[in-house]
Amino acid sequence: SQSTSGASSVGQAAALAAFEGGLGFLAEQVAAYRQRRDVLVAALGQVAGLEVLVPQGGFFVFVRCAGLLGRYRPDGQRVNSDADVVAWLLESGVAGVAGSAYGLSPWFRLSIATATDTVREAGRRIARACAQLHSGETT
């Protein structure tokens, strides 16, 4: 039979267990995300052309990439937008989302909801990819 009101006994038991279980796990999660955030912010803070908005919570880091716009990839393609930056990063092994998808151009979003070593490697790959962009001028 179906019920249209009241919580099931299984649901009630699960809710009670969640409330009685305490929040000890939360401190561990906060510390882990803070470490990942700090690793990525430190790495990207060294990259010319990027500015990082340090998040106070959550698991996304927003990065301003206006300093990369107008530069050229090694294949000669011009980087005109945050979407172009994200496409270049994807080719370099890092997935992100263009800020223009949220009305936040010229920013892009990165997730830190992964292992710290993965975040560290992403920072290295982003630095390497950005270092490959050039002004297009020959000297």
Give the label of every model feature segment.
Residues 1-139:
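PLP-dependent class I/II
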